[in-house]
Every structure is written in structure tokens, then in C-alpha cells.
């Protein structure tokens, strides 16, 4: 799937706007339990579908609650995106949990343990 320059620009604008909407306008207490960061947006070639990757700081319960809150707010967020960005078609939004930051942190901790001489398997 080739990513066009237009899709990249639209995805970046969507990322910024969705982050603003979640931070400033969505009033769901489930989203306040964990810190939600939008890490990326992946658009389909026809720009009808968008996968929004989010990183949620907190324990497993906070992540689950935040994902439920995002699922409930999806139609509101989509409507706001449609009003703020001049797109022919407002993409259907799907939120996906991005665990790459946590995975990278785990790798860094393991490397630090190896450097410190702790060779225990994990």
C-alpha cells in the first residue's frame, strides 16, 4: 500500500486535531484515569478509514477504561474532525492501543540490567 503525500498530510492533521479533541473536549472520566497520547494515524488509500494509534499511561485497568471511553467518543471525534478539516469524506475512526513505547521501555530496562551484570532471564 503506497502512502501518498496527501495521505501523510491528512494523517498528521488528524493526529493533531484528535489529540486536541481528546485533551480539551472529550469529558469522559475514563479518559482521565490514564494519560492518553495519540501516537499515529494510518489512513486507507481512499481515506475512508483511519486507524488511530494511542498510547495510554497507566495500569491495565486504566488502559481498558480509556479504550472504552475512546470507543464511546468515536462518533463525537469523527464529527469534530469532519467540521475542522476540509475533507470530501470524513474517515471512519478505529482506535488501536499502541504498546511500542512500553515495549521499548521494557527493552531499555533489560539492557540496563545486562549492563549492570544482572543476567537473569525474563
UniProtKB/Swiss-Prot annotation:
Keyword Cytoplasm: yes
Keyword line: Cytoplasm, Ribosome biogenesis
Disulfide bonds: none
Entries under Gene3D superfamilies matching the protein: 3.30.300.20
A Pfam family of this chain: RBFA
GO CC annotation terms, alphabetical: cytosol
Annotated PROSITE patterns: RBFA
Location(s) in or outside the cell: Cytoplasm
One BP term from GO: maturation of SSU-rRNA
GO molecular function: ribosomal small subunit binding
Domain of life: Bacteria
InterPro entries for the chain: KH_dom-like_a/b (IPR015946), RbfA (IPR000238), RbfA_dom_sf (IPR023799), Ribosome-bd_factorA_CS (IPR020053)
Subunit organization: Monomer. Binds 30S ribosomal subunits, but not 50S ribosomal subunits or 70S ribosomes.
Family membership: Belongs to the RbfA family.
Summary of the function given for this chain in its UniProt record: One of several proteins that assist in the late maturation steps of the functional core of the 30S ribosomal subunit. Associates with free 30S ribosomal subunits (but not with 30S subunits that are part of 70S ribosomes or polysomes). Required for efficient processing of 16S rRNA. May interact with the 5'-terminal helix region of 16S rRNA.
PANTHER family: RIBOSOME-BINDING FACTOR A, CHLOROPLASTIC-RELATED (PTHR33515:SF1)
Name of the protein described by the UniProt record: Ribosome-binding factor A
Gene transcribed to yield this protein: rbfA
Amino acid at each position: 500500500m503506497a502512502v501518498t503525500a496527501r495521505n501523510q498530510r491528512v494523517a498528521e492533521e488528524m493526529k493533531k486535531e484528535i489529540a486536541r479533541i481528546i485533551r480539551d473536549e472529550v469529558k469522559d472520566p475514563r479518559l482521565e484515569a490514564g494519560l492518553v497520547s495519540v501516537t499515529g494515524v494510518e489512513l486507507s488509500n481512499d481515506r475512508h478509514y483511519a486507524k488511530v494509534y494511542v498510547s495510554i499511561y497507566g495500569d491495565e485497568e486504566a488502559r481498558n477504561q480509556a479504550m472504552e471511553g475512546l470507543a464511546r467518543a468515536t462518533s463525537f471525534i469523527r464529527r469534530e474532525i469532519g467540521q475542522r478539516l476540509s475533507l470530501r469524506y470524513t474517515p471512519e475512526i478505529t482506535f488501536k492501543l499502541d504498546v511500542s513505547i512500553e515495549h521499548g521501555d521494557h527493552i531499555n530496562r533489560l539492557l540496563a540490567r545486562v549492563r549492570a551484570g544482572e543476567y537473569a532471564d525474563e
